[in-house]
Curated annotation (Swiss-Prot):
Keyword Electron transport applies: no
Gene: KCNF1
GO MF terms, alphabetically ordered: potassium channel regulator activity; voltage-gated potassium channel activity
PANTHER family per record: POTASSIUM VOLTAGE-GATED CHANNEL SUBFAMILY F MEMBER 1 (PTHR11537:SF171), VOLTAGE-GATED POTASSIUM CHANNEL (PTHR11537)
Name of the featured protein: Voltage-gated potassium channel regulatory subunit KCNF1
Length: 494
């Protein structure tokens, strides 16, 4: 102990037995001073703070391998780290677990825990979920950046056919890559609308004509327009298929299955009509053709390829399966109960419209969904009361899952916008680093610190003001592991 009676650290290089569990450890993290005790830190001897207890025995080399600076006069260790995250990390010594405060980036907090050598197993489960979500976002950003770099890069070792495939794939799948690609995307979008309008107009009796057998068929002009649209869709699908990097994954993806369903009925109908005319079975073939024509409505789903809003809505519905399942179950129970009550209460009326409970299902469905066609309605007082209650229950049942579905839609839509912005920002940073050489960034990384020359032997203990080190932090997260390689690729693609 010193003259004031306080417990303190021994001088660096000494082998005093005072470096024990009852000494004080004074740390200054980002300007925030904290006094810790050895008996508290020794609970987890593998952590960085616990290593400070006996670090003075190894001299200044050991001290500066653990901290950024050390003031021998104040016996104070300095760390250029986040003080808010540090306050959360030291909770492990008091409570045996770590909780991450709101407003701290989960990835940055994970890096702080790695710096202080606190295992992630001490992080509470609620905080681990935030960390996992942020990791997934960074992986998605890295994937998007990698895709953009792959589109920009041209490998000289690739053959001409492979380079042609990549150009066609980029031309069809990346409308923002060039002005002609954007024009083709707009043209495809307009043709989808035209084909859908033609399909609807073909059912108008005034626009139909009589064939040789006296049957009403679509006007030849509408058929020609539809044939042209189908030809474009077929060409587009084949080009996508031949230029796709993974043809099996391409063929099994949802949007490409929709493309097949949009064009397949046309060719099947054409084939059946031709074969039916030759086999004198035109009546049966026409029935098959009419059944296949209904599949043409699948082409409207092709709009989802050109609409991020429709894709977001699809994702929101997929994430809301639980809420939608609860809605259907609630409606099913209500339909069964109110249809049975309605049938029972209406049996006293001589002109009842409720002939059976299964027939009453229809009335319960249109009542609970607030449609109310009026083809079946109650005539007794109890039946009308039952109808009013079923109506109110239907309104409540339909309104309950709306809020979670909207939340899922807004959350996913905002997340996609953030990921797109982050990917573009990452590319801008990589381009800036490549133009500046990537080695002269302000505030060096950990690799910059590792390349610093070691302290000369026999040098006097530096003070807090005399020892200057690069200010650094681990808050920068490289999204791609081979950052220098990607910077080089980006520079070569200019």
């Amino acid at each position: 102990m010193d003259g004031s009676g306080e417990r303190s650290l021994p001088e660096p290089g000494s082998q005093s037995s005072a470096a024990s569990d009852d000494i004080e450890i004074v740390v200054n993290v980002g300007g925030v001073r904290q006094v810790l005790y050895g008996d508290l830190l020794s609970q987890y001897p593998e952590t960085r703070l616990a290593e400070l207890i006996n670090c003075l025995a190894g001299g200044y080399d050991t001290i500066f391998s653990l901290c950024d600076d050390y003031d021998p006069g104040k016996r104070e260790f300095y760390f250029d780290r986040d003080p808010d995250a540090f306050k959360c990390v030291i909770e492990v010594y008091y409570f045996g677990e770590v909780h991450m405060k709101k407003g701290i980036c989960p990835i940055c907090f994970k890096n702080e825990m790695d710096f202080w050598k606190v295992d992630l197993k001490f992080l509470d489960d609620c905080c681990k979920s935030h960390l996992s979500e942020k990791r997934e976002e960074l992986e998605e950003i890295a994937r998007r950046v990698q895709l953009i770099l792959d589109d920009l890069g041209v490998d000289a070792a690739e053959g001409r056919w492979r380079r042609c495939q990549k150009c066609v794939w980029k031309f069809l799948e990346k409308p923002e890559s060039s002005c002609p690609a954007r024009v083709v995307a707009v043209l495809s979008f307009l043709l989808i609308l035209v084909s859908s309008v033609v399909m609807c107009m073909g059912t108008i009796p005034e626009l139909q004509v009589l064939d040789a057998e006296g049957n009403r068929v679509e006007h030849p002009t509408l058929e020609n327009v539809e044939t042209a649209c189908i030809g474009w869709f077929t060409l587009e699908y084949l080009l996508r298929l031949f230029s796709s990097p993974n043809k099996l994954h391409f063929a099994l993806s949802f949007m490409n299955i929709v493309d097949v369903l949009a064009i397949l009925p046309f060719y099947v109908s054409l084939t059946l009509t031709h074969l039916g005319a030759r086999m004198m079975e035109l009546t049966n073939v026409q029935q098959a053709v009419q059944a296949l024509r209904i599949m043409r409505i699948a082409r409207i789903f092709k709009l989802a390829r050109h609409s991020s809003g429709l894709q977001t809505l699809t994702y929101a519905l997929k994430r809301s399966f639980k809420e939608l399942g609860l809605l259907l179950m609630y409606l099913a129970v209500g339909i069964f109960v109110f249809s049975a009550l309605g049938y029972t209460m209406e049996q006293s009326h001589p002109e009842t419209l409720f002939k059976s409970i299964p027939q009453s299902f229809w009335w319960a469905i249109i009542t609970m969904t607030t449609v109310g066609y009026g083809d079946i309605y109650p005539k007794t007082t109890l039946g009308k009361l039952n109808a009013a209650i079923s109506f109110l229950c239907g309104v409540i049942a339909i309104a309950l899952p709306i809020h979670p579905i909207i939340n899922n839609f807004v959350r996913y839509y905002n997340k996609q916008r953030v990921l797109e912005t982050a990917a573009k920002h990452e590319l801008e940073l990589m381009e800036l680093n490549s133009s500046s050489g990537g080695e002269g960034k302000t505030g060096g990384s950990r690799s910059d610190l590792d390349n610093l020359p070691p302290e000369p032997a026999g040098k006097e203990a530096p003070s807090c003001s005399s020892r200057l080190k690069l200010s650094h932090s681990d808050t920068f997260i490289p999204l791609l592991t081979e950052e220098k390689h990607h910077r080089t690729r980006l520079q070569s693609c200019k």
